[in-house]
Amino acid sequence: MTATWQIVVHGLVQGVGYRAACVDEARRIGLTGWVRNRRDGTVEAIAQGEPDQLLALCEWMREGPQHAQVSSCEVDKAWVADSPIKGFEQRASI
C-alpha cells in the first residue's frame, strides 16, 4: 500500500550535499517525492512509496551523507498528498 511521509531532518544538514545525496538514495530505493532546504536550517522531504521503502529512506536520512551531522529526524506518517508524485527531485529552498 503506497504511503506518503513527511521527513524533517535537524542538525548540520545544509551546505553538505544532503539534498543531492537524498535524491540519489530515494531514487535508488524506488521512491517518488522531493527534498528541500528550509529557512530554519532543516531539510524537509516528502516521499511516496511502500512502507518498507520509506523506512529505508528514514534510516538513511538519520545518518545522511558523509559531512552531515544529523541531530534528530521527525517523521509524519499521516501526511496526505494531493495526488501521486512522479519522480524524486530537489526543490528550491523555502
Language-model features and meaning:
Residues 1-94:
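Intrinsically disordered, low-complexity, mixed-charge
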